Amino acid sequence: MAVVKHNEAEVELLARLMRAEAEGDGDLGMLMVGNTGINRVIASCLDFPNIRTITNMVYQSPGGFEATQKGYFYQRARQSEIRLARRVIQGERQHPASNSLWFFMPEGACPEQWYGQWNVGRYKAHCFYAPTAADCPEVFR
């Protein structure tokens, strides 16, 4: 069962975002970026109180994804990426992104905190940051 409402266009949109943000980190990295995005749709806390759809999440401004400003994001999603997006929408979670709401790619080590949120792990190039369960209980359900 899907963890967020969606249509086929949103599955492809999520797939394009996952590829544009983390293709260099492979399938697992793309799944983690997808986890972070879906967590933003599920959450109604912190930076994401009015994000209720995949489309809202992908194009959130300010605070959205840098990849949406680059041409590569607008290329059609491949079937393999669409399959990964479906897995995330169905609720598959990958550590350290299981409860994350933010990620970024630093040049060096992951900062312990990023905008007041704690680092929960790194996968290849990306550092992941999660809220506390007290601040954002929806992403811990």
Swiss-Prot record:
Q: Which GO terms describe its molecular function?
A: hydrolase activity
Keyword Cell wall biogenesis/degradation in record: yes
InterPro entries xrefs:
Cell_wall_hydrolase_SleB, SleB_dom1
The name this protein goes by in its record: Cell wall hydrolase CwlJ
What Gene Ontology terms describe where this protein resides (cellular component)?
A: extracellular region
> Has UniProt tagged this entry with the keyword Metal-binding?
no
UniProt subcellular location: Secreted
Keywords carried by this UniProt record: Cell wall biogenesis/degradation, Germination, Hydrolase, Secreted, Sporulation
| BP GO annotations | cell wall organization; sporulation resulting in formation of a cellular spore
User: Would you identify the family this protein belongs to, as annotated?
Assistant: Belongs to the CwlJ family.
Please describe what this protein does. Answer: Probable spore cortex-lytic enzyme involved in the depolymerization of cortex peptidoglycan during germination.
